[in-house]
A protein has these predicted regions:
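N-terminal, positively charged nucleic-acid-binding surface of large information/translation enzymes
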Residues: 1-181
């Protein structure tokens, strides 16, 4: 094995190597066995997954990540999940614009419904179940794009705790919180 420093070092593959190592070692995985006094919890509002990513997304989450890393260096067990806000009006608008459709709750579901390959000039009225299906399909794609970005940036979140606000579990938790008021 040569210890000589190369004339031109290569960074190819370093990012993937370290990301894979951190993931396999559970470097940022939250340890639920820690006592409450040892835990530092970060609750960030999940980014709205309804469009294009921009530098503002990276800028705002970098601040939080710096705090998470600082707390870990100080010995805290950091609870830092990541979520996606993909439930509500922004998602509906994104689906309407992306597919050229609008929800008509009076229409019956169409068996084997497929979205138009290109958005029509006038919005196509579709049933609520078909509309919800398109919402779930598009948000899954958008969530993956967001996750790819955050992983590439190297956010130190616990990926095993990721959630989405459109998921049944998150909706039920939200409803329980509102009902408890």
């Amino acid at each position: 094995m040569s210890l000589a420093v190369p004339e031109k070092p290569s960074l190819d593959g370093l990012e993937a190597k370290w990301s894979a190592l951190w993931e396999s070692n559970g470097t940022y995985r939250f340890d639920r066995s820690k006592s409450r006094s040892e835990i530092y919890s970060i609750d960030t509002p999940p980014p709205t997954v309804s469009g294009s990513l921009h530098i503002g997304h990276v800028f705002s989450y970098t601040h939080t990540d710096v705090i998470a890393r600082f707390r870990r260096m100080r010995g805290a067990e950091v609870f830092y999940p990541i979520g996606w806000d993909d439930n509500g009006v922004p998602t509906e608008r994104r689906v309407e614009n992306y597919f050229g459709v609008r929800c008509d709750p009076h229409l019956p579901a169409e068996e084997g419904f497929e979205a138009p390959p290109e958005p029509p000039s006038r919005p196509l009225a579709i049933s609520r179940p078909d509309f919800v299906s398109l919402c779930e399909r598009l948000t899954a794609s958008d969530e993956q794009a967001f996750e790819d970005l955050w992983r590439r940036v190297g956010l130190s979140v616990d990926w095993s705790l990721s959630y989405s606000t459109i998921a049944t579990r998150a909706r039920q938790a939200s409803q329980r919180a509102f009902c408890a008021c």
